[in-house]
UniProtKB/Swiss-Prot annotation:
Its main location: nucleus. The lineage of its organism: Eukaryota, Sar, Stramenopiles, Oomycota, Peronosporales. This is U1 small nuclear ribonucleoprotein C. U1 snRNP is composed of the 7 core Sm proteins B/B', D1, D2, D3, E, F and G that assemble in a heptameric protein ring on the Sm site of the small nuclear RNA to form the core snRNP, and at least 3 U1 snRNP-specific proteins U1-70K, U1-A and U1-C. U1-C interacts with U1 snRNA and the 5' splice-site region of the pre-mRNA. It is found in: Nucleus.
Length: 138
């Protein structure tokens, strides 16, 4: 059975299983070797990262980035904006403002006759009833 080789650590793993590979990848020695590997490419680009960012790994899906210290937008310390002002990412686009419709509750009472195309009961000869009787015969 082929053994697993780690390019970063330049070694073969002693336990070739998924659990063994995961444990190796979580180890401090492997993480340090990965950090050193990528630092050789970032050295000429001026990218500055502290060791904590490398060792923490990627952020879990759906998590928020860390908040900067100090007040933002004139709000309370900790980054909360003042009341009534949406957060930066939630600001509406510039332009005419359309307000959402206000819900006023259910209508009170039946609608008036003739309102909104409604009519009274059908008259003689209208669809839905028997034909009108003629005075001249059957």
């Amino acid at each position: 059975m082929p053994r697993y080789y780690c390019d970063y650590c330049d070694t073969y793993l002693t336990h070739d299983s998924q659990a063994g590979r995961k444990q190796h990848n979580r180890g401090w020695k492997h993480r340090e070797n990965v950090k050193l590997y990528y630092e050789q490419f970032l050295a000429g680009q001026g990218v500055i990262m502290n060791p904590g960012e490398w060792l923490r790994g990627p952020a879990p899906m759906g998590s928020l980035p860390p908040r900067p210290n100090g007040p933002m937008n004139g709000g309370m310390p900790g980054g909360y904006p003042p009341r009534g002002v949406p957060p930066r990412g939630m600001m509406p686009p510039p332009g005419p403002v359309m307000r959402p419709p206000m819900f006023r509750g259910p209508p009170r009472g039946p609608p008036p006759m003739g309102a909104m195309g409604m009519r009274g009961p059908p008259g003689p000869g209208a669809m839905g009833g028997p034909p009108p009787r003629s005075i001249y015969g059957p």
